[in-house]
Swiss-Prot record:
NCBIfam families: minC (TIGR01222). Belongs to the MinC family. Keywords: Cell cycle, Cell division, Septation. InterPro entries: CAP/MinC_C (IPR016098), MinC (IPR013033), MinC_C_sf (IPR036145), MinC_N (IPR007874), Septum_form_inhib_MinC_C (IPR005526). Residues 118-127 have a biased composition (Low complexity). Residues 108-127 are annotated as: Disordered. Interacts with MinD and FtsZ. The keyword Lyase does not apply. Cell division inhibitor that blocks the formation of polar Z ring septums. Rapidly oscillates between the poles of the cell to destabilize FtsZ filaments that have formed before they mature into polar Z rings. Prevents FtsZ polymerization. This is Probable septum site-determining protein MinC. GO terms for biological process: cell morphogenesis; division septum assembly; regulation of cell division; regulation of cell septum assembly.
Amino acid sequence: MSPKKSPFFELRSGSVDTLLFVVKTTDLEAMRAELTRRFEATPEFFANDVVAIDVRRLAGNERVALADIAQLLDSVRMRPVGVVADAQQAWAAESALPLLEARDRRGAAARSADEESANAAAAAPAATAATATPPADLFESVAGTPESGTPATAAAVEPAPAAEPVRLATSSQTMVVDKPLRSGQRIYAKGDLVVLGLVSYGAEVIAEGNIHIYAPLRGRALAGVQGNHDARIFCTCLEPELISIAGIYRTTENPLPADVLGKPVQIWLEEEKLMIEPLRLT
């Protein structure tokens, strides 16, 4: 038998999808209070989700107790798997968690532009459209490679196995799911995804392109997961646990307007905000 092959295990290059907990302050109690406020109504929402602690937003002379943040995340049932830091933040390597290298979707320049836009938006009048207020300041969806650990935003994502096999039909880069998805099932499409049945609470549909759901959406829908800001979500009945495009999230903690809740809608990104508009089908 070749020494490079084994019936017992394999070592392969791969990718996993995870979240970034983006630290903006060294005030642990402020983070604890904000986590409690955001998730006290849905304490199981991110249960067992893996997360990497991202400290790159901290100033060069600021330090934070990574073990305490890991315990904080563990208290809300998230699973810290590593730390993302800039090269000058050598102190982060002292953590018991592995130091990971992230490849952001838009790069550091875009992050700076985002911060400037956020400051400008804070001084401007509030928009009146059905916009989302995503918790992206706390969580940003990323993907990672095993060589660096977990987080990296430009890598492919390997989905978790579904609870039961789901029959799929694919054409070019479009995947079609013709059965309802029950809690615990997850579908991943490298292009567009079309779902013909119910997406139940606890189910998850993920696509690098657009998502079309011709039934109620009650679970999670994540479109444009590889950073495609032009991706959209279409559904005939919007009742989601979570919607996301290119890492910008909206959860049930931010109630949907009555004119879109339970209605046919389309969802897209505009200036880093999720826009939700009723679909006029007649």
